[in-house]
């Protein structure tokens, strides 16, 4: 790296220059009393000091160590004239590495070597600009050299960009597993589950590992059009990955075949290459699905257990399971709508519907906070402010639901945005089965703010899902 000035490594002049500069950074923002009764005035020169630090790095003035960063597998070497004191303040590894030498050769993967200048810059001024492709190498460098603040910052960046739908979730998931970053791993897994349709249609789907695939197939909170879409996504993955038969058969057995209508099951058996190859491994599950669709749920429950995951719907976006609801200017006033869902996934109930009424209130107040204008003695009491309330969503059946014997309904509300014609889920709220609303629905949302993460062009995009959950009413006779 070119530089305009240079001091002898380890010189006392270099030491005192650096010590003075660090002192300036430490005391850049301070309070000063201007005398008399005047208020204290803030004197903040931190930006100027940061600029001087950047100049130190760029020009190499008063440097006392040299870092030679070689990209693995190449002859490319990048040279950085740096300052032992600043590197050691952030990294115990640098402190130990440079304690007895003024020059170090660092071997780094090519992607890490390419962003090493940004990494060093962060050690000097505490900021950097991150691109999606640079997140993993920067996080890897921060982890290797023990710069915990940068490690947390890059991980936060990755989680935030997952929520925005821009991040390569599959690659980041595998990276998180390899580094043991449980928080990032769980964030990636949640994003993939909530946006499986978009991921399965992208180039990332081919990079999914068998372990990640198995993690996804076990989840009931997958968001996708229907179970048939999941089967087709799995079949496409099998065609690309060509895993061992045991892996393929275990994955095929994770499909919830009772959630697929009989007509579509017949088509799968006739046309699916995966079933043609591994059909015997799932023959019992297909028979179970046909039996489930042929009998009434009450009759089926007399002989078979319906509490297994095979009979629990996932978060399906198909019209039979719910409806989208876009609320423009959601902070303005109360809104209501209604929609219908099928009574249950059984073919026996294919023509039976349940009507649901939905009420949205942007500023609902609990009874304890509702306005009271006077007490018994006529003394005026303060009214609660509208901003004291919170958004509320209530979903109730339009009738008593007498046809729903042996069934309870699990309600889920997805909050998200549409990008390129696909629903991108940012938040999901599940109702307790005995409740008509989600207690924490948009609890921290500011719907008054137009750039709120919950709004898209000042509209709240919801998708309401109702999942019937069967209960075993009569034990199977022995």
Curated annotation (Swiss-Prot):
Q: Which CDD domains match?
A: BACK_BTBD17, BTB_POZ_BTBD17
Which positions make up the signal peptide? 1-28
One GO term describing the cellular component: extracellular region
- List the glycosylation sites: 61, 100, 195
Asked if Transport is a keyword of the record, the answer is no
Keyword Signal on this protein?
A: yes
> What SUPFAM superfamilies does the entry give?
POZ domain (SSF54695)
Q: Which UniProt keywords apply?
A: Glycoprotein, Secreted, Signal
Domain called BACK: residue spans: 169-269
Q: Name the GO terms of the biological process aspect.
A: negative regulation of viral genome replication; response to virus
Domain BTB stretches: 63-132
Superkingdom as given in the UniProt entry:
Eukaryota
Report the locations given in the UniProt record.
Secreted
> InterPro entries per the record?
BACK, BTB-POZ/Galectin-3-binding, BTB/POZ_dom, SKP1/BTB/POZ_sf, TRAF_BTBD17
Q: What is this protein called?
A: BTB/POZ domain-containing protein 17
Report the source organism.
Homo sapiens
**Native organism taxonomy:** Eukaryota, Metazoa, Chordata, Craniata, Vertebrata
